[in-house]
Amino acid sequence: MVKQIESKYAFQEALNSAGEKLVVVDFSATWCGPCKMIKPFFHSLSEKYSNVVFLEVDVDDCQDVAAECEVKCMPTFQFFKKGQKVGEFSGANKEKLEATINELI
């Protein structure tokens, strides 16, 4: 399941409540073509990796979160463990997304 983040508070809360689990954050926008293309794959990964927390941040709805995380383009995927960023890449690269998850869990 992918949790939609609506605020900076909800983002911090999700990172904190994840504990030891890997957190994967998809920063996207409704108008972004590549974001729309990879969204179903991101959701399928959330079903496949039940021990990983998947979050989705709409950069237009949560500009403060996107700014704090220094997101420059969409889609950007960031990876967190224990509240600390442990990885990041931009672009709708399915293989790299799944490979990075496998590397970090």
From Swiss-Prot:
Keyword DNA-binding: no
GO BP annotations, alphabetical order: positive regulation of DNA binding; response to radiation
Assigned protein family: Belongs to the thioredoxin family.
Stated name of the protein: Thioredoxin
PTM annotation (S-nitrosocysteine): residues: 62, 69, 73
GO molecular function: protein-disulfide reductase activity
Active site: 32 (nucleophile), 35 (nucleophile)
Gene name per UniProt: TXN
Residue numbers of N6-acetyllysine PTMs: 3, 39, 94
Chief subcellular location: nucleus
Site (Deprotonates C-terminal active site Cys): 26
Modified residues (N6-succinyllysine): 8, 94
Subunit structure: Homodimer; disulfide-linked. Interacts with TXNIP through the redox-active site. Interacts with MAP3K5 and CASP3. Interacts with APEX1; the interaction stimulates the FOS/JUN AP-1 DNA-binding activity in a redox-dependent manner.
InterPro entries, alphabetized: Thioredoxin, Thioredoxin-like_sf, Thioredoxin_CS, Thioredoxin_domain
Keyword Transcription belongs to the record: yes
